Amino acid sequence: MATTSNGIAVSISNTPQATNDVFTSAQTGLTDNALTTVYLNVMANDLGGAAKTLYSLDSGTEVTVALEQTALLTQDTARAEAVSTDYSAHGAHIWITSDGKVGYDASHLDASWLSNSFNTLGYAQDSFTYAIRLGNGTLSWATAYVDIAPPAPVVALAHDTGSSATDHITSDCTLSVGGIAHGATIQYSTDNGAHWNTSFSAVEGTNTVLVRQIDVAGNASAASSCCFTLDTTAAAAPGVALAVDSGSSAVDHVTNVGTLNVTGVESGATVQYSVDGGAHWSTS
């Protein structure tokens, strides 16, 4: 608690009145793909009743507790982002709002810190400190932690089989998933996000698969989608005949014209030929 002299705070200590907070990505919507401004109610779990007010903010990066407490002794009178000079531990712009919350502008977060956190730790958690003033004028301080979920995965078909490698028509539904945070769990959904699992089963025909990652702290990324058509049904054998059976007989298969008449070919299919019993195939 702070002691006061003539109503001015001169010291502060970490006591139970102000309680540490953890704001998850599920609560704030903050992800590496959505670094927006959110408003954090840090006093929701603090003691002190209705008379308490949010007094000051700081990055929480002071090297000693004494220095941190000193930094929080100065009251923040600004109530707008434009005039606040406070930042979180990793660069988010923070300020006290007119209704007693903390404005948190995540667009200012250090991009290198975010990337390194996901790649090495497997999660990204920012923080800042705050002090509350109780009804009797005393101060109490705590730390607020803010989780940032990892980026949406990079998803593509591992093998786009068939005549085109870019038409998303394939006989192989294996997905290639990249951009995964260290230790994260990959999840898939085939019902537009209603249910998630660590694997999926594609169906014959059109598929839309959502893919997300869950970091080691339990924060879910935004989802990426991959749309493809799965075709594992073998085409029916085509009908084949000589286009021209020349000579004295039109049915003896003795001809001087090697052109074939191929029928019953599936739309979009590629016709291939083999002259060595199927050991090798080509389009002519």
Predicted regions and their residues:
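Acidic, turn/loop-rich segments in luminal/extracellular domains of secretory-pathway
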Residues: 1-2, 76-150, 192-206, 214-219, ...
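Extracellular interdomain linkers/hinges and stalk-like, low-complexity segments
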Residues: 1-59, 127, 131-152, 233-234
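Surface-exposed intrinsically disordered loops and tails
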Residues: 27-30, 64-86
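Short, solvent-exposed loop/turn segments enriched in Ser/Thr/Gly
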Residues: 33-41, 119-128, 170-171, 207, ...
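Acidic, Ser/Thr
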Residues: 43-60, 176-182, 261-266
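Low-complexity, disordered linker/stalk regions enriched in Pro/Thr/Ser/Gly
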Residues: 151-284
